[in-house]
């Protein structure tokens, strides 16, 4: 009898803790929890409020903490967010090279069919290399996408070898229907005898490869909707403001029929592309080249990045409201 009472006691305690966890979790968590999607040919976290109203949807290319933050923010503002990783998880490629764009097409077609999504208002958004990818995706699938937001963008597609941790063999970063997306071929960045490395000139040298840049330039004029670019004028990782200006030049030359904004911030660096609620005091990142660790500069200032990210968030929400 005592033994049964003991079991009942512990079952009661476990039940109390289990129920209490969910009650407390609901009280403390005021965000919107994602619906995990792991079928239909892609993996993603889907953020949406319960509603019968169709809303604009934003696809966060690259997913991760950054994508989940924005997915939740957009859902809280009355939109839909899809945080979409494409590498580094089980079932996905390990490295960002030879990434098949059909993966994103599957996600976009699924998203477009959701009852809470307005199929005429689907935006892709990315930061840094994922800004490059967002622009590429939007230029190839104009029938599925009606807007792009790119933080610290690129005007061209690059080879896989721009990333030190990728394979050494020259490959495209992106492919579609078995065909390489044209790219600027780059040797891997070379280390030195110090503990720091400068990356900005590496990318500028790539942009000077006139034999490759014309065909590698992203065909932004094919994008079927407004484009919003953000960059920091003091970006020391890569020349994002310069590349944003090149995108603008191509847009102007094509008589682009949609809205276009190229917003550049003073005293801001590459971290304008980072999580907007995290203001890191670190001004350098880490890179491993041939087994040796180096530091590289992000550029900008702590205050400059903070102000830029706050201002950009306001502009971003205004942009989406207008689509």
Where are these regions (language model features)?
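Conserved alpha/beta-hydrolase
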Residues: 77-92
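Alpha/beta-hydrolase fold nucleophile elbow
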Residues: 116-128
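Hydrolase active-site cap/lid region
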Residues: 137-204
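Short beta-strand element of the alpha/beta-hydrolase
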Residues: 54-63
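C-terminal catalytic histidine-bearing segment of alpha/beta-hydrolase fold enzymes
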Residues: 245, 257-323
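Short beta-strand/loop motif that positions the catalytic acidic residue
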Residues: 223, 229-231, 235
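N-terminal cap/lid segment of alpha/beta-hydrolase-fold proteins
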Residues: 17-53
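Alpha/beta-hydrolase active-site loop
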Residues: 95-115, 136
């Amino acid at each position: 009898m005592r033994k049964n009472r003991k079991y009942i006691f512990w079952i009661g305690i476990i039940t109390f803790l289990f129920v209490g966890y969910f009650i407390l979790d609901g009280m403390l968590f005021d965000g919107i929890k994602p619906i995990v999607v792991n079928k239909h040919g892609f993996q993603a976290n889907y953020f949406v409020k319960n509603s019968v109203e169709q809303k604009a949807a934003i696809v966060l290319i690259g997913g991760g903490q950054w994508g989940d933050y924005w997915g939740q923010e957009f859902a809280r503002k009355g939109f839909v967010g899809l945080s979409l990783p494409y590498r580094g998880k089980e079932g996905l490629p390990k490295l960002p090279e030879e990434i098949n764009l059909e993966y994103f097409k599957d996600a976009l077609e699924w998203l477009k069919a959701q009852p809470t999504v307005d199929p005429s208002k689907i935006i892709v958004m990315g930061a840094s290399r994922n800004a490059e990818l967002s622009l590429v995706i939007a230029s190839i699938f104009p029938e599925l996408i009606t807007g792009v937001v790119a933080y610290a963008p690129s005007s061209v597609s690059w080879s896989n070898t721009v990333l030190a941790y990728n394979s050494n063999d020259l490959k495209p970063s992106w492919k579609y229907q078995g065909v390489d997306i044209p790219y600027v071929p780059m040797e891997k960045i070379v280390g030195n005898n110090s503990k720091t490395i400068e990356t900005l000139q590496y990318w500028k040298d790539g942009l000077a490869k006139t034999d490759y840049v014309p065909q590698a330039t992203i065909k932004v004029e094919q994008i079927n909707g407004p484009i919003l670019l953000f960059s920091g004028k003091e970006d020391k990782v890569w020349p994002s403001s310069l590349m944003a200006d090149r995108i603008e030049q191509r847009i102007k030359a094509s008589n682009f029929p949609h809205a276009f904004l190229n917003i550049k911030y003073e005293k801001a660096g590459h971290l304008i592309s980072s999580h907007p609620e995290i203001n890191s005091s670190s001004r350098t990142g880490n890179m491993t080249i041939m087994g040796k660790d180096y530091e590289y500069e992000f550029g900008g200032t702590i205050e400059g990045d903070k102000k830029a990210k706050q201002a950009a968030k306001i502009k971003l929400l205004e942009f989406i409201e207008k689509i």
